Amino acid sequence: MRRYILKRLLQLIPVLLGVTFLSFAMMRLAGSDAITELYGDKGAVSQEIIDAKRAELGLDRPFLSQYFSWLGGLLTGDMGTSYVSGRDVFGTFVSKLPATLLLTALSVAATVLLSVPLGILAAVRHDRFTDYFLRFCSFIGNALPNFFVALLLMQVFSIRWRLLPVLSEGISLRSAVLPTLTLAIAMSAKYMRQVRAAVLEELNRDYVTGARARGVREGVILGGSVLRCAMLTILTLLALSVGSLLGGTAIIESIFQWDGVGKLAVEAITMRDYPMIQAYVVWMAVIYVAVNLVTD
């Protein structure tokens, strides 16, 4: 086991290097940088000042020189300084993590509470109205993009019924309701079908047929054997959902102005804040790699 884990960890090194290199390259190919975004449209700022600022930040150096300089800093724990705010990237990033972790935890809990019972119910009521209805709802949930679900929930719960704030009022459970529901609806629609398939596969196995022939009650079969065998699939889905939520909440955090890592990343991308963008890329890469390792 130790050898396998060590082997997988060594395999992660080229993956992380490749991801950071590609993201670094794509940002440079965008055609503008943070200095252009900050001063480019201000006629009062001369080109000499812009060039001097770009040289101060090292943006005038060759691409590979910039990349290896950043990589060297990363290996020593220095992610650099934000081009826009002037603050330490690592400190800023860490300060936003609690909000994203809270949103992720709530979304995973809501996803499990929705997808697992509904998936089991659809499997138990296989080829009946309940099954067809739940599968139809799952299809609709998969088809709707997250931003549309977010706007729909805003319209209903915030604008029409005035039960919840439209935008975040700080890191609180009340402000977390709508972004949590948005993320949970989309993920539950996908995972419900997979839970249904896993449970249905177990229900069709020979040991279930034998248990039914011996007169074992359906509830005992489902709770004692089927769910235990299907738990591997459910736990795998849970692990993958954690990874996708930790790394993929940027749009939802921006819509609801939830002050987390995702919102920080969107602002950094808008302003071409390279050090902050790279921190987010490293975060996403580490999360997905770690989740895949744990799942394996």
Annotated model-derived regions:
Residues 2-4, 93, 97-130, 146, ...:
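Alpha-helical transmembrane segments of integral membrane proteins
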Residues 6-12:
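N-terminal signal-anchor/signal peptide hydrophobic helix marking the start
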Residues 12, 20, 43-44, 139, ...:
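Residue-level recognition of pore/gate-forming positions within transmembrane alpha-helices
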Residues 16-68, 161-178:
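Hydrophobic alpha-helical transmembrane segments of membrane transport/permease proteins
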Residues 22-29, 58, 72, 136-165, ...:
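Membrane-water interface segments at the C-terminal ends of transmembrane alpha-helices
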Residues 23, 27, 31, 35, ...:
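Membrane-water interface at transmembrane helix exits
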Residues 26, 30, 38, 42, ...:
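Hydrophobic aliphatic residues
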Residues 59-116:
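An internal, D/E-rich "acidic patch" concept
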